[in-house]
Amino acid sequence: MKKIKKAIIPAAGLGTRFLPATKAMPKEMLPILDKPTIQYIVEEAARAGIEDIIIVTGRHKRAIEDHFDSQKELEMVLKEKGKSELLEKVQYSTELANIFYVRQKEQKGLGHAISSARQFIGNEPFAVLLGDDIVESEVPAVKQLIDVYEETGHSVIGVQEVPEADTHRYGIIDPLTKNGRQYEVKKFVEKPAQGTAPSNLAIMGRYVLTPEIFDYLKTQKEGAGNEIQLTDAIERMNNDNQVYAYDFEGERYDVGEKLGFVKTTIEYALKDDSMREELTRFIKELGL
């Protein structure tokens, strides 16, 4: 069985929920404190043993490439000024993994974005990490899925429970059997209508997929939002070859919409020793 050493991070979206900030700035580069959100995702992949990462980008995304590239002039200035801590942070972001880029030429959905990286992946199993979800966990969320893949040899989809009122916002699984945190899946449903979801186990932006998924994506018809939906292709693959779901452990932060982004920023700031005391005092002064 081939080891999981490659990952895809889709980052071609327009980021319309954060306009006008994302008119010229990639949404993935918006920072949680002093680190862009996409770096948290790359760090998770690297901690999970991923060596090669392909980031699927689009127009106006050059800042992502610049961030993970070395900047010798900046490094020299920091070194000359004795700012060793900042220098270490800057260099760290360039050394996480081997990072490559491919452009999604049309905005045709997540499934289409994954297809854009087919040549990079070849005939290997691979991970997918979506940038809207930062997961804090002792064992990286995607590593938990990799462990299930190495045990079963089958594709694995990361899920977590959500309130029933929110199920229409996610891809949802209809579980068949349960073994601890692992599920066999009867079917996958992309954004079911309110009140029709088969469970409250939602797909949460972490996948380990076998290369056969590309064959299903190639023939996948447009689905929700008139886009090529990855969930729809996974559902078809599941009909031929069992796909598992795994309820991964960890605290998930939704940074794909404004309120979640603000909540995440506040929570991370409260974890920072240099900010906690003053921020706590400020929040109390608001008298909310």
Curated annotation (Swiss-Prot):
EC category name: transferase
SUPFAM superfamilies in UniProt: Nucleotide-diphospho-sugar transferases
Catalysed reactions, semicolon-separated: alpha-D-glucose 1-phosphate + UTP + H(+) = UDP-alpha-D-glucose + diphosphate
The EC number(s) this enzyme carries: 2.7.7.9
InterPro entries cross-referenced by the UniProt entry: GalU_uridylyltTrfase_bac/arc (IPR005771), NTP_transferase_dom (IPR005835), Nucleotide-diphossugar_trans (IPR029044)
Function summary: Catalyzes the formation of UDP-glucose from glucose-1-phosphate and UTP. This is an intermediate step in the biosynthesis of diglucosyl-diacylglycerol (Glc2-DAG), i.e. the predominant glycolipid found in the S.aureus membrane, which is also used as a membrane anchor for lipoteichoic acid (LTA).
Protein name per UniProt: UTP--glucose-1-phosphate uridylyltransferase
Gene: gtaB
